[in-house]
């Protein structure tokens, strides 16, 4: 990610992948462009069913195409270094679920104890308190993941969140 260069809204050309060195601080090889369509920022990576998943937030220039502004999209590949193929949208802009909470979208997708989750932020608390300033609150919801083929379906944003998995002591 890193913003949208002028005139390059559909293909910003700002995403790269590269192999990490064994020390996890160096790189091996040269970073390679992967070109997520309408990329804005907020990249994430997962491996599901042998597929490599690259998820990201789309930019604010998606009018006139099947994508929408500031939603979480994903691409898949058989290799962590690509090539990646656009595979769809998994989370709409938070303003879809929480009126008045539109904004850029940051997320993480992860599995815990056999259940898949998506975390994200929205301005729900700010709006309920009647204040402004772009204050974001964290949310977590379930996300449908097909672990046999690596596809991800759309998640729904809620204020209820998820059920407690277990008690801590």
Task: Give each language-model segment a name.
Residues 1-169:
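Carbohydrate-active catalytic/glycan-binding domains of CAZyme proteins
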């Amino acid at each position: 990610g890193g913003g949208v260069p002028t005139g390059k809204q559909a293909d910003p050309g700002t995403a790269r992948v590269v192999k990490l060195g064994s020390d996890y601080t160096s790189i091996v090889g040269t970073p390679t462009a992967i070109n997520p369509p309408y990329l804005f920022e907020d990249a994430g990576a997962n491996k599901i069913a042998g597929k490599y998943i690259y998820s990201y937030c789309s930019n604010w220039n998606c009018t006139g195409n099947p994508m929408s502004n500031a939603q979480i999209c994903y691409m898949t590949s058989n290799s962590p270094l690509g090539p990646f193929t656009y595979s769809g949208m998994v989370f709409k802009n938070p303003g879809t679920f929480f009126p008045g909470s539109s904004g850029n979208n940051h997320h993480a997708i992860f599995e815990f104890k056999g259940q898949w989750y998506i975390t994200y932020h929205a301005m729900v608390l700010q709006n309920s308190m009647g204040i402004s300033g772009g204050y974001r609150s964290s949310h977590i919801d379930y996300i449908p993941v097909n672990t046999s083929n690596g596809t991800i379906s759309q998640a729904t944003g809620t204020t209820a969140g998820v059920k407690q998995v277990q008690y801590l002591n």
